[in-house]
Regions:
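Acidic, glycine/GT-rich loop-and beta-edge segments that sit at the periphery of enzyme/chaperone cores
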Residues: 2, 165, 284-337
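Glycine-rich phosphate-binding loop plus the immediately following alpha-helix
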Residues: 45, 129-182, 194, 199, ...
Length: 388
């Protein structure tokens, strides 16, 4: 339902289109936040999610009541160019949004899906300038995407039968991952300078029998340690220090950072500061950039922005053996058998063969981050099945 015309052109909309999520803020002419969209993963379907978001905004506020729709974020520039609307660089947007929430903020820790950055702000009365900026390189170490991947690999929620990729499923996995890590009393030593070495470190710790909660906490502690050593380096951070971005929702990551910065602040709207900043900038410039849904549908965003997709692979000529344990086979008293066990980072397999290379028994199960415990269960399973 549209609002009355007397309230027309009252709202400025800011949308942060990141590598992982969409975040949206709506402000009124008094710079007050009137709406924040829930944190939403786009799974590469940016065009569809933007269309759904704009449709919802038009329905909620009325198309004619919106003065400006503006974009920021890693995918925001192409969208703005296609639609002919305002765009602001995400670093400036993040600072503007953070300063609106905490006007005296001096240091801004930003951690998103693919980027981590440090922004230091110098204040001169009512004015400010970006004193220094430092960001990660092309490696995904320390980013939200890498933590998502490790959560999916380690969290017990992954081993439910329902393995669909959805917002709810990933939220469930991350919640399980974080809650388990919060139980740790002593973080394991995980090197987080490189994603490859980090994963290798974690697998090695699993194989040593380290508690899973200690590995998870160690990952977050290592993440904070790597940020301090590589991004902060020898700089002294001025207070207040503000933590924003998708990873600022992660209670375990906040805990790890507070070991270095006890007064660290996670503000309200912490995942939407970029969206807030670009909405404020557009309002300040008195921009009047809008579009209708027809323009959005004609923009053909899919070809330029959405993640490229190929046809699903199909195994047409490959025969896969049954992954379930073989049927019980009783062994003769003097049968010599040979057991091979493959303990991987995600699955554990064994095969039992006789002297003629015939398969006697096999099994394939998820490692679940507990290689020793799972291997013990498999050995017990052999005894129960074969009476060996």
């Amino acid at each position: 339902m549209k609002m009355e015309k007397k309230n027309s052109k009252n709202y400025s909309v800011g949308i942060d289109v990141g590598s992982v999520s969409l975040n949206c803020i709506v402000i009124d002419k008094n710079r007050e936040i009137v709406f924040e969209s829930p944190y939403k993963r786009h799974f590469g379907k940016i065009d569809e999610e933007i269309l759904n978001l704009i449709e919802g905004l038009f329905e909620k506020f009325g198309e004619n009541n919106i003065q400006c729709i503006s974009f920021t974020g890693s995918h925001g520039k192409k969208l703005a160019e296609k639609l002919g609307v305002f765009y602001e660089f995400e670093t400036i947007s993040q600072v503007l949004g953070a300063l609106h929430l905490l006007p005296d903020a001096k240091s801004l820790i930003c951690m998103g899906g693919q980027d981590t950055a440090l922004l230091q702000i110098h204040h001169d009365g009512d004015k400010w300038e970006l004193e220094s900026f430092n960001a990660n390189g092309p490696c995904a170490s320390g980013t939200g995407s890498f933590l998502d991947q490790q959560a999916e690999r380690l969290a017990t929620a992954l081993y439910e039968k329902n393995k669909e990729t959805s917002q709810n499923q990933i939220d469930r996995i991350l919640n399980d991952f974080i809650c388990l890590g919060l139980k740790s009393g002593k973080p394991a030593n995980v090197a987080c300078r490189c994603t490859v070495f980090t994963k290798s470190d974690m697998i090695h710790l699993q194989n040593k029998g380290e508690k899973l909660e200690d590995i998870i906490y160690g990952l977050h502690v290592g993440n904070a340690r790597n940020y301090v050593s590589t991004i902060v380096s020898n700089q002294k951070l001025g207070d207040p220090i503000v933590f924003v971005g998708g990873l600022s929702k992660n209670e375990l990551q906040v805990k790890a950072f507070k070991a270095y910065y006890p007064d660290l602040i996670v503000p309200r709207h912490n995942t939407s500061t970029g969206a807030l900043g670009v909405a404020l900038k557009a309002l300040e410039l008195k921009r009047e950039d809008t579009f209708d849904l027809g323009d959005l549908k004609k923009a053909n965003l899919r070809g330029d922005i959405a993640v490229p997709k190929a046809p699903r692979l199909v195994l047409k000529k490959t025969e896969l053996p049954d992954a379930q344990p073989s049927r019980r086979k009783f062994l003769a008293i003097r049968t010599r058998a040979f057991l091979g066990i493959d303990i991987g980072s995600t699955t554990t397999k064994y095969a039992l063969i006789d002297e003629t290379h015939h398969l006697i028994h096999k099994s394939y199960v998820h490692t679940q981050g507990k290689p020793i415990e799972v291997t013990q269960k498999l050995l017990k399973h052999i005894v129960e099945e074969l009476g060996a």
